[in-house]
Regions:
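Glycine- and Gly-Pro-enriched alpha-helical subdomains that act as flexible
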Residues: 168-190
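A contiguous pocket-lining binding segment that forms or flanks enzyme active sites
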Residues: 184-204
Length: 275
């Protein structure tokens, strides 16, 4: 599949990869691969007019996760990634996802248009205990996290925050959690079951380069009241929490988004052309 041909005919759908044929065949976005097969590994990012942020980091995370879960050989993973990158469209806004099937061990590319992007986020703060089975790897728990987000949506929220049984905040269902305590950028302890987020890592590195103190802290939802809190991921970038919703429980007050705009502008500047 050549890059030129793919750009001219890019449509939403799923492409399966094999060493001999490369990427072939596409089914509808709404279908379920391999009779509802669970994903062993997944990774995704925003692609805007052929530009992407931190693609090399997504590659590293995906290849490492595939290796940790007994996936294809490194050579096959590298070849898949090359073919996948060549197949990405260079016009429009997309949210592609790379996948490794849990049973079939099949490598796939899901091409889908990006949903509307947000600059702020309403968060369900009822305290959703973390339901994941493999929290440090993206893929196995996407379905259950999707159900968590659906529940949050019924409460008028865009996202839900996961907590430990003892009430410590972890991350969003689809995003990393960061917050500010005075001039310190904070995030959950690495000892807690959180996913290593690409966007979160970029933000932490910028903070360290510019002299902003970064600290790992254990906090409950109540501790985040009146603080500037960000949910960050590869799709939306930085979204400050604009409202905490909690159904019948008392609502937390959202802090002002004092720093978010400047950091969002910096993050947007990291978009680079596909190689």
């Amino acid at each position: 599949m050549t890059r030129t041909a793919t750009q001219a005919t890019a449509t939403e759908g799923r492409l399966a990869w094999s060493p001999r044929r490369g990427l072939t065949g596409a089914d509808s976005v709404g279908s379920v691969p391999a009779l509802g097969e669970r994903l062993a590994v997944a990774d995704s990012w925003l692609l805007r007019d052929g530009r992407v942020r931190g693609l090399g980091r997504h590659r590293e995370r995906f290849l490492r996760a595939c290796g940790d879960s007994g996936g294809p050989s490194l050579r096959q993973l590298v070849d898949f990634w090359r073919d996948m990158t060549d197949a990405l469209p260079h016009t429009g806004e997309w949210f592609p996802r790379v996948e490794l099937g849990a049973e079939s061990r099949e490598l796939r590319l899901l091409l889908r248009h990006a949903p509307p992007l947000g600059t702020g986020v309403r968060v369900w703060a009822a305290g959703q205990t973390d339901p994941r089975t493999v929290p440090r790897r993206k893929g196995p728990d996407l379905d259950i996290l999707g159900r968590v987000r659906q529940r949050a949506s019924t409460e008028g929220a865009d996202e839900a925050v996961l907590i430990t049984p003892s009430g410590l905040v972890l991350e969003g269902a689809t995003s990393s959690l960061l917050w500010w305590e005075d001039d310190t950028l904070c995030l959950p302890s690495p000892q807690l079951p959180v996913l290593a987020g690409v966007t979160s890592a970029l933000i932490q590195e910028r903070a360290q380069r510019t002299g902003v103190r970064v600290a790992h802290r254990e906090r409950t939802l109540a501790d985040l009241e009146d603080r500037e809190v960000w949910l960050v991921n590869a799709l939306h970038g930085i979204r400050p929490v604009t409202e905490w919703t909690g159904g019948t429980k008392p609502l937390l007050r959202a802090g002002g988004a004092i720093r978010a705009a400047e950091w969002r502008q910096w993050l947007e500047g990291l978009m680079e052309p596909l190689e």
